[in-house]
Amino acid sequence: MVRDGLVLLARRSGHRRRYPGVWDVIGGHLEAGESIEETLVREVEEEVGVTPNRFSALGEIDEPNPEINDPHVYHLFTVHDWSGGEPRLASDEHTEIGWFSLAEAVALDLALPEYRDYFRRVLAAG
């Protein structure tokens, strides 16, 4: 999610099995029969309590997953517009959310280092 040159990130709860306590983008896992876009809308609603109205695909990150011997695929989107007010912490999956400039975002301890390249692309585009 982006607004006024800032990106919204969430700090993962310490009890999370993967990437506890680090900053992450808003997102989650596909459910059976769900499209990637439907997953995006559902996860944003669940995690920050707003409904995406306008979004665009950015790309994918493939991360090795030794637990299932198959890569974990992250589909990245930019949410440009939403309804439902200000994004707010709406899930126990995270302990806090915040808006960050490019310089701030790339300096954070992130779940995936590849996010930095996406932040640069999104925030440089305005």
Go through each PLM region and give its residues.
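N-terminal strand-loop-strand
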Residues: 1-24
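Structural detector for helix-capping/boundary residues
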Residues: 5, 28, 42-43, 100-103
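Structural motif
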Residues: 7, 20, 55, 71-76
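A generic structural micro-feature
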Residues: 19-22, 67-73, 91-94
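The catalytic Nudix box helix
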Residues: 25-58
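Active-site-adjacent beta-strand/loop module that shapes the phosphate/pyrophosphate-binding cleft
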Residues: 61-86, 98, 103-104, 121
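Nudix hydrolase/Nudix homology domain
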Residues: 84, 91-126
